[in-house]
Amino acid sequence: MRRRFLIPALLTLVTSASACAAEPVRQDILGEDSVLAAAQGVWRSHESGWILEIDEDGITRWQDTPAACYPSPTDGPTLMGQIEYRYFTAISADTARFQYLPGDGHARFERLDALPAHCTANLDTSPQAVFDVFVSVFERHYAFFDARGVDWPAQVGTARRQLRGDMSEAELFDLLAGMIAPLGDSHTKLIAQIDGERRRAQFGLGDTLPRIDATLGETPWLIGLIQQTVTDVLDEDAQHIANDRIITGTIDDRVGYLQFFTMGGFVTEFEAGTPQWAAAELAALDTIMDEALTQFEGMDAVILDLSNNRGGYDAVCRSIASRFTDAPFLGYAVSVGNEPEPVARYTIEPAEGPRFTGPVYVLTSDVTVSCGEITTMMLRQLEHVTQVGATTRGAFSTPLAKPLPNGWYLELSNERFEDTSGTAHEARGLEPDIAIHPFPEDSPVAGHAAAIAAILADLDPR
């Protein structure tokens, strides 16, 4: 699962599932009365830098870095820092995959004889120790220094010369934030609590959102966009539904319209990140897509509007893609770290419910990020799909969570999402077939309606 949600924060979760023999056998780690015996022991993932220490009392997660190994709290400020593994799949006697949710993820763990000797709960929280862990985590796990044009060793050398043992927390935070700023990666962030104040360093948010924040303000802008779409663009039966995450309707009774603000967050009755939540999200999506695509049957085209999509749960993205194909296709592959081959490939099977395989237009912008980009990348591989709008953000990877020894919270990008040609679009985004900015500087609300009008104009000659 993944990414930053509009309201509230919701991130894609990642890990894995595989098998021990001909057929994978996934088992619950935490039963009602006991912890799965096969999962007990010490397990390490080099891909993610996590160690799981599992005994009859439950799971303790350790951060395993070249600079230090220490317990990882489960009360982080984002969902990726709060969730825990729930499922275990043996590959062999000494290797296994652990999952947060069924069907997502790919990190492989190897069994250790014992917790490594350098792992300790006695944390060194000095500026030097925190700096060393921060640097080592990036060196081991960050996947896009080259793609983002950053000379990390040079960054480290410059910052190390500024490091002092008597630095204040605020000074250290500024130093580390300055190191990640040149990456321009919105899936890489540093969050801290300093003197009772929450601080967040996150960069690479594109041009539109910072401009909107400095002028209209994001909330008034979104309200204006929603009112314009429902009142002026769509027919009278338009709906704003699914906990305000989706707009659905038609245009002139001949073009179907679906806008997703987030890929999840449709339900509120379950704790985010739990299996019950995941099942409810997909069930809610199925109901919405069944009704919408039944209404769209026989129409000239469908517009899938992801121009304001902030990402979400990867299974939702794959489920959406399954509604626009009549044949299986490879959606994408995921590689981690320096692995020469993808660790996971996702084939999209046609949905059992209603599908639409006429002309489909996917509307994007530099706000489109993460799972919104993955959906775009999958669909634009299909001949009947046209991407319209502006180039997407270029931040695909699920954030890898790394709490630092002093309690600060780091997330970074360690995965490469690749299309069927093996191309990763991280840092550059997905360029549209038809270029028109939905949120231009001189008309950030009206420009969205103009982009939809451009789609209709392209459709007419067809």
Language-model regions: role of each:
Residues 1-9:
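Bacterial N-terminal signal peptides that target proteins for export
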Residues 8-17:
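Bacterial N-terminal signal peptides
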Residues 21-302, 306-332, 401-403, 459-461:
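Flexible, low-complexity junctional segments that flank or bridge functional domains
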Residues 29, 311-363, 367, 398-403, ...:
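Gly/Ser/Thr-rich loop/hinge elements
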Residues 256-259, 302-305, 331, 359-364, ...:
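Structural recognition of the beta-strand scaffold that forms the well-ordered cores
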Residues 359-381, 386-393:
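Extended C-terminal subregions enriched in glycine
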Residues 370, 380, 389-405, 410-412, ...:
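C-terminal soluble interaction/assembly domains
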Residues 423-462:
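Low-complexity, Gly/Ser/Thr/Pro-rich intrinsically disordered linker/tail segments
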